[in-house]
UniProtKB/Swiss-Prot annotation:
This is Solute carrier family 35 member B1. A motif (Di-lysine motif) lies at residues 321-325. It is a multi-pass membrane protein. InterPro entries: SCL35B1-4/HUT1. The gene is SLC35B1.
Length: 325
């Protein structure tokens, strides 16, 4: 009887990771479509076509919706938990989180969406490196191997050799530098979140609320100081149809972020970065299956590496030790 009760109590914990993965996958699948539609779409006709260049305003709206959604979650589901995390930690985390998001969105003005996804697929590497160097974490060897396999698999799956000279053909430019900056800041965000999780047992909804509130404050000052707010409002007045996409973009972000912060709190930022990286892979694999697109030999190798990495992580990559603090 006691054993059955123990098994029942562990069932929600076993379901938590699949729920987090499916939540992140579903929300960010649509999020990615909307992001590319907004940032790479052409607005207007003929010679008067315009591009959306308001990365700060887009992320500002995203953070406002995220914060409001987190406040609702706390109000109805998490009102008992007290939050003891220092405000300066939230502020530091929001700065790196913001920088990563703005850099990533800005990169889409210079590189195409697959290039951006491929760059962000390397996210587990800075998260792991900074976890080891700054927080003195010690991961099992299998964890290093599985991260390497997943990142390599995604890279192989998404890589397409250049077919000839074109508008997007370049070696390393401003867009790639922005992606590199975004990856570095992702790693710093992971370090901040790990610190909050280890020292203050910060809840996922409180983390989501406070990081987004600080981000809203910083971005609000930024769009007012640069004058981008007025240019953005003028743009939406000229092309009101974009407002619907931006609001949907914010809602999918808020839902997805609630699953992301839940993953960070229960499983750590490295597991979260593995989930988000794998999600990108499955998004592309789904399009291949649904639309019967052919898969090259290199992509099949990438597919095998991703599943091998996930299998190794599920079986051997659970343990993590701290050597200090």
């Amino acid at each position: 009887m006691g054993a059955n009760a123990g098994r029942r109590s562990r069932s929600p914990e076993r379901l938590r990771l699949p729920v987090c993965f499916l939540g992140v996958f579903a929300c960010y699948f649509y999020y990615g479509i909307l992001q590319e539609s907004i940032t790479r779409g052409k607005y207007g006709d003929g010679a008067r076509q315009e591009k959306f260049t308001f990365a700060l305003s887009l992320v500002f709206i995203q953070c406002v919706i995220n914060a409001a959604f987190a406040k609702l979650l706390i109000r109805f589901f998490d009102s008992v938990r007290a939050d003891r995390t220092h405000s300066w930690l939230y502020a530091a985390c929001s700065l790196s989180y913001l920088g990563a998001m703005v850099s990533s969105n800005s990169a889409l003005q210079f590189v195409n969406y697959p290039t951006q996804v491929l760059g962000k697929s390397c996210k587990p590497i800075p998260v792991m490196l900074l976890g080891v160097t700054v927080l003195r974490k010690k991961y099992p060897l299998a964890k290093y191997l599985c991260v390497l396999l997943i990142v390599t698999g995604v890279a192989l799956f998404m890589y397409k050799p250049k077919k000839g000279a074109g508008g997007d053909d370049h070696i390393f430019g401003y867009g790639e530098l922005l992606l590199l900056l975004s990856l570095t800041l992702d790693g710093l965000t992971g370090v901040s979140q790990d610190h909050m999780r280890a020292h203050y047992q910060t809840g996922s909804n409180h983390m989501m609320l406070n990081v987004n509130l600080w981000s809203t404050l910083f971005l609000g000052a930024g769009i007012l100081f640069t004058g981008e707010l007025w240019e953005f409002l003028s743009f939406t007045e000229r092309y009101p149809s974009i407002i619907y996409n931006i609001l949907l973009f914010g809602l999918t972000s808020a839902l997805g972020q609630s699953f992301i912060f839940m993953t960070v709190v229960y499983f750590g930022p490295l597991t979260c970065s593995i989930i988000t990286t794998t999600r990108k892979f499955f998004t592309i694999l789904a399009s291949v299956i649904l639309f019967a697109n052919p898969i090259s030999t290199m992509q099949w190798v990438g597919t095998v590496l991703v599943f091998l990495g996930l299998g190794l992580d599920a079986k051997f990559g659970k343990g993590v030790k701290k050597t200090s603090h």
